Design a protein with these regions (language model features):
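Nucleotide-activated chemistry modules centered on ATP-dependent adenylation/adenylyltransferase
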Residues: 8-416
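Basic polycationic patches enriched in arginine
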Residues: 2-4
Length: 416
């Protein structure tokens, strides 16, 4: 009690530096930041940006934690629609997967969180913004780049990074002040949002170690296999099993379904924004299901060169977003191309769900380029004759034929 009273007195006496907006999750690192920044003379206003990863009960707990560790005020922003409209829609339409496996669950949120924190900071008349990222991960880059672009006039304060604070040090600091340590403070760093859940720490640091069985095996009480139907308009899902549902609501519904089946669990190893390798575990069933279904519908309606160039640009888009470069103008150009490419990506996909896996088993579209009335692969067609096919095959062989002749030095006539 004495330590808490001393801390409260210190915060009152040292508020000379003015208001500061702190991106706040209610976790250990940001809980540490509140009293630490108050000791440094800031009036700390916490900002929780809901990107789809919390229940009403969890948001209430975050509010209580902010007050308990000394926040001057606490602000909640519902950014689920913004995350979907600004980021997730292009990750679906672009089929964006990092390393072909991971759907950028965290990168899809961080820039929006920075945007919302800046808006709140300006409304408060804040002189600075702060976040609780360490100096070893991608989030510090994502936050810092966004904050510098959006609000170059505001100071960026990062106590965890600047002081090199470890988790055990943060716990000891809060305990010394008599302040509550978040109940989930432990060996893992967990991020849950609209586009999936990730966790790092423990087994993720050993590339030979695997996750606990409960994070790999399907739930023992998983439902029986079933099929669902997704309706699509211009590359975005608009209905589930005939019921109109779109945006964050549809993603959340698919997330609940896939979680029950244990769908979407995986491990990703990749390059970080800092150039080192990193490893995480993730569960992102809705993201993987939507991207998988969308890709199959695209195969039905896009030409091969549309698909080829979309794939290249989708990978580049995901790479830039992953590394905090959302504001690069080239991404707006890519978004325009992606949007244009989706003009005919309308139809339905039928998806079979089973414990631990899913499969797209059917697609249909009014714009389907697979027309069995004029051609059936491997069987018959009405678009060309056998002689025309023979001539086409002969011409198609020319580049490779010429390369082979050049390689062995022969000059035999191609007509012989």
């Amino acid at each position: 009690m004495r330590a808490r009273l001393k801390f409260a007195y210190l915060c009152i006496m040292q508020s000379s530096r003015g208001p500061l907006a702190l991106a706040f999750s209610g976790g250990l690192d940001t809980s540490y930041c509140v009293p630490r920044l108050a000791e440094d003379g800031w009036a700390v206003h916490t900002v929780y940006v809901d990107t789809g990863g919390s229940t009403p009960e969890e948001r209430a707990a975050i509010r209580r934690q902010a007050g308990a560790v000394g926040a001057a005020s606490h602000h909640e922003i519902d950014a689920r629609d913004l995350v979907y409209d600004r980021f997730v829609r292009f990750l679906i339409q672009g089929n964006v997967l990092r390393g072909e496996v991971y759907p950028l669950s965290v990168a899809a949120e961080r820039t929006q969180q920075a945007l919302s924190v800046v808006e709140t900071a300006r409304a408060l008349g804040a002189r600075a913004v702060a976040h609780g990222s360490t100096g070893a991960g991608n989030d510090q880059i994502r936050f810092d780049v966004a904050l510098r672009v959006l609000a170059p006039e505001l100071e960026i304060v990062t106590p965890i990074r600047d002081l090199g604070i470890k988790r055990e040090q943060a716990i000891a600091y809060l305990e010394r002040l008599g302040l509550p340590v978040p109940a989930k403070a432990g060996a893992y760093s967990i991020n849950r949002g609209l586009w999936g859940t990730t966790w790092g720490g423990g087994w993720t640091h050993d590339t030979w170690a695997g996750p606990p069985a409960e994070l790999v095996d399907p739930p023992a009480d998983a439902p029986a296999s079933r099929e669902i139907v997704l309706a699509w308009e211009r590359g975005l899902p608009v209905a589930l099993d005939g019921a109109a549902l779109a945006g964050p609501g549809l993603v959340a519904a698919l997330g609940d379904l896939s979680e029950a089946y244990g769908i979407g669990r995986g491990i990703h190893v990749g390059e970080t924004a800092l150039g080192i390798k990193g490893r995480i575990g993730f569960e992102a069933g809705a993201a993987l299901l939507l991207i998988g279904a969308h890709r199959e519908l695209e195969k039905l309606v896009l030409t091969k060169w549309q698909t080829f160039w979309k794939d290249q640009l989708g990978r580049f888009y995901g790479d830039r977003l992953h590394e905090g470069q959302y504001f690069d103008p080239s991404l707006r150009d890519i978004e325009a191309l992606i949007t244009s490419s989706q003009a005919r990506v309308t139809g339905e996909t039928r998806v079979r769900l089973a414990p631990g896996r899913f499969q797209v088993v059917g697609t249909r579209s009014p714009h389907s380029m697979m027309d069995t009335s004029v051609a059936t692969y491997g069987e018959e067609n009405r678009l060309w004759t056998g002689d025309e096919a023979r001539a086409f095959a002969r011409v198609a062989a020319v580049p490779s034929l010429l390369a082979a002749r050049a390689a062995d030095g022969t000059r035999k006539s191609s007509s012989s």
